[in-house]
Amino acid sequence: MRRPIYFDVWGSRGSRSIVPPLSRIGNRTSCYSLLRAPTLLVLDAGLGLAALTHAMSTQKRFGGVREVHVLITHAHMDHWEGLKDADWFWRPNRGLEVTLHGADEALEAIRLGYSHPLYVPLRRLAEGKLRRLETRRLRAGQRVQLGDWTVETCALNHYSGAGARRLFLSTLGYRLSLDGGPAVTYLSDHEPTSRTRKTERRMTRDGQLVVLDAHFPDISHHAFGHGSQEHAAVVARECPGALVLAGHHGPAFTDSQIRVSHRRHGRGLRNLELAVEDRSYVWNAPRRSFARSGR
C-alpha cells in the first residue's frame, strides 16, 4: 500500500510573530513539514514547531513517525526559537530520533541560544524523552540522503542591515525529492537578484511544490535579505507544474494587505497560493501534484 505524503504549513509569518494572534494567514514564525512515515522532514523550527509537535501527539497520520530531520536555513533565531517548545522535549519516552541539520553558523547559534544560563541545553531536555538527538553540519552544494528522501542544498542571499553595513548569513535553501514521488523546494530567507536566478531555477526544476520568501508585496521593496509576492508570481509563471506558496509574510502587513498583493500579482495564476498556517496538502500520485487536504 502506498504511504501518503503530506505537506503542512505550521508557521508562515516572517521575522517575528504576531501577538496577540490576529491573523488568519500567519501568526507563528517559520515552520513547514513533509511527512511520509516513518520519516518526517521539518523545514525551519520557528514558533510553528510547537503546533507541529502538538499535532504529532494528536493526529493519527503522525503515528508511524520514527525519525525527524529538522532542516534549519540560517542562524536568525526566528528560525529556531520554537525548539524549546517542541512537544517531544516535554513528554517521556517518545522513541523518536531527531536530527538538527544546518550550516555551522546556524548550529552554533542554536547551541549558544540554548546553553546555560540562557536556557536548558537541548541535549539535557532530550534526556528520557528522545531516543536520540543529533546535529549534522551541512554546506551549500551538498546532496544527502535522509530516509527515502534526497536533500539538495544551495546558498541563499540573506543578510541583516543595509548598504555597506550589511551582515551576510550562511543561509541554505533545500530541495527534497523522492524517487517516483514529489520534489519540494524551500527558499527562505532569500532576496532574489539577477545573480541568484540560475540557482533558483536549478532548485525548482521539474518540482511540484515551492515555498518562497514573499516578505514584501513588490520586487522594488526587496531588502534585508527578503523577497516578495511579485517575485513568487514570477516563479509560478516559470514553473506551471508546481504549486508555489508565498510565505514569510512580513509582520507589519495585515491579512487584507497580504491578500490584496496576492490578487494583484497572482492574477491568472492558479498555481500561486499564500502559505496559510494549519493548511495541509496531500500528494496525488496519479496527477503528480499536491492538493489541499480536507483534514
Explain the meaning of each model-derived region.
Residues 1-185, 242, 255-294:
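Binuclear metal-dependent hydrolase catalytic cores
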Residues 190-279:
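Cap/insert and terminal regions of metallo-dependent hydrolase folds
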